[in-house]
């Protein structure tokens, strides 16, 4: 019954977009090209993924969840190791310093087009690295096998290193917030010995990064810091061209300029190309971009009030469920913060690289918060 109500939210939105399309195709005066791919996205991801998650009700146990989380981390680690070797090859061993500097300078390859038969964008890749780094850290305290603990510790360090290669402010900020939540929980629940180990580990982590990657990190991060300061000043002067904060402020500003077009009913199938036209004609240097870089605004433009309500529901439903059942999972809280922060700087819920996995995780957070809760209390 609960699963039916959850799926009904997305089914209602799908029907709304369908009716909206029938209405707008008859009465719309816009010359923009319609994009019908939203029906595929809604049906395959927003409806079928929650149905799949509900179907796991009889099988998902803390033990199976642990294996899923471990394999998720291992898969992300292997993918990024492949990416690194694809970028620098054996230079990682023959000239490690230059290879690391190259990875920082190129932000782990940036957006990788035609990669393994598809496209791998930097923001979704960063999201997965941040999520799996936190999960690997969490699993260190769940597994009892010392060998697995060491392996997970190495996995956590590597994933954290890979995250730093991306030089993605939102991803790093999201990771830091999630990491803080995880350590708050661990300090509350752990013994003095474990607390001491956590503190020692955190203290040692900074020097390790300083020794091995400081040169590359320093140069690229100084460049990004200067870029942020410069763009903040540009925004104050009404200049929105740039590659970090300025265009995102410009996207929000441009969206609210046209809020009368989408604020209530949304633009539906015309949203994609309509937004492109806004940016092209903005005069604020936004013409090189193609979207608003914010999932909440994206679905507000697409579905109006109902679209915005659907996205807010996605993030609020797991918290509502946890407080209602009084089974609060701190891992869920940490991962939700990561997903929320990054969706405010990129349309991750609209990209094929990330939409499916985000909806899968959000569905699991809602339906199986009790399984996460039991796992955190040692029930395996």
Label for each model-derived stretch:
Residues 1-33, 59-66, 70, 142-150, ...:
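Transmembrane signal-anchor hairpin modules in multi-pass inner-membrane enzymes, especially those
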Residues 6-10, 148, 154-157, 290, ...:
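Loop-to-helix entry and N-terminal half of a specific, functionally important transmembrane alpha helix
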Residues 134, 179-180, 314, 332-344, ...:
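Transmembrane alpha-helices of multi-pass inner-membrane enzymes
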Residues 238-253, 257-303:
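Long extracytoplasmic/lumenal interhelical loops at the membrane interface
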Residues 186-237, 256-260:
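A membrane-periplasm/extracellular boundary helix in multi-pass inner-membrane enzymes
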Residues 74, 180-184, 282, 302-340:
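Hydrophobic transmembrane alpha-helices and their immediate junctions
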Residues 9-15, 31-56, 67-77, 127-128:
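Aromatic-anchored transmembrane helix interface
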Residues 51, 63-98, 117-188, 212:
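Alpha-helical transmembrane segments of multi-pass inner-membrane proteins
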